[in-house]
């Protein structure tokens, strides 16, 4: 057999085999187990959620709650009461954030639009100070990583 013919056969075999291997090894970020229950204090810190359907390597229907600290996520059973409550909280929060706020006051467009003067002195924008993670919040965040296997 000629070497170029062997090289063509190997190339065809690798070309046909590589997509199948790539599809099997594709990384899907999905839940493989449910969390039993998450306290309301932790659940209200979630910034979004996503429904997971059964497809591909994700063989468990779930609701995934995403938390801002260190890309944490919590998987819940869609029928659980705490999951329904969390979805309702986030839906209401997103609905409230997306709705434009109208008031009876008229603001003028200018370099300081949106800043109201509170006193006769100079006005300063309100600054909020955020503290770093505390020891107890790290402990609570570590509780989010434990899960109970689904049915």
Curated annotation (Swiss-Prot):
One of its GO terms (molecular function) is chemokine receptor binding. It comes from the Eukaryota. Keywords: Chemotaxis, Cytokine, Disulfide bond, Inflammatory response, Secreted, Signal. Disulfide bonds join 30-58, 31-75. Residues 1-23 form the signal peptide. Belongs to the intercrine beta (chemokine CC) family. PANTHER family: C-C MOTIF CHEMOKINE 25 (PTHR12015:SF70), SMALL INDUCIBLE CYTOKINE A (PTHR12015). This is C-C motif chemokine 25. It comes from Sus scrofa (Pig).
